[in-house]
Amino acid sequence: MHTSKRMTIAYLAMAAALLALFALNLFWGSIALSPSDIAAALLGRGTNALAANILLQLRLPRAVMVVLLGAALSVAGYLLQTFFANPIAGPFVMGISSGAKLAVALTMVVFLNRGLLTGSLTLILAAFAGAMAAMLFVLAVARRVQRMSILVICGVMIGYICSAITDIVVAFAQDSNIVNLHNWSMGSFSGMTWGNVATAAAIVLPCLAAAFLLSKPMAAYQLGESYAASVGVPVRAFSVALVLLSSLLAACVTAFAGPISFVGIAVPHLIKHTLGSAKPLRVLPGCALGGAAFCLLCDLIARSLFAPTELSISSVTAVFGAPVVIWLLVRRNQEGAR
């Protein structure tokens, strides 16, 4: 099959899957909504006030938020894999999500214990600061080690340290706030509002557009820094852009939904395998579509499998994402042994 035809089919399939999963997220739940209920609520002609409230205030903003954050997480993972030239680099593995998680937990505990409310922008700024701190630590380690496996292990250790400190911080939260902090720290898309959607969209969409605009120099960067510099890519500025974009995307996800594992690692590789191409110009849009669809599927499972009990989203993404990482490591080991 020709590459262009294969990509066309793959993109159409991903778009169809995204639309189908988005619709299912609106229909399914502890209270099932019929297509007529959905249409009436969207058109403002419904007489069922409960159905309209469930759709417009709960399920629709949540589904839109899942699409935004799923796309952000997948693209952030791809940017990190490009920057570190490491196939298992990702916001969760490299400790970036955990750094953001620690900063947000500190901010929430300080504000909530003083009876103050934390706005979305405050949490995002805190998450970005934590993500950048973790990223700078990883970069400092990267200058001292040659083997990427050591760097990944250091990233995982950073994640454990940040998670341990976060647990200590949560222990000092007031009893009334512990449940919310615990649910957030486990990863969840529940409780999303249209205000959250607007704030996330204002950050995620420009970052995704910027990443797409960087796809051409990214392709040169993948061939090595020397080659990228020889074709006119400002390597230092480009590297800073990758770090900032990936950290901001990961921070936005963590601020709203908590740390979510394996999406940033697994989805980019599934997209490259599906498209049969590793070119950023082709992979980046696929990562956005694939990440959104993957998170919609996982969120649907998380809230429907044992309803009304809702699973943490990170638990579900790990179940589906971890086997992909294992497959990737086994395949690379087999290729290296040849």
Per-region residue spans from a language model:
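Alpha-helical transmembrane segments in inner-membrane proteins
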Residues: 1-338
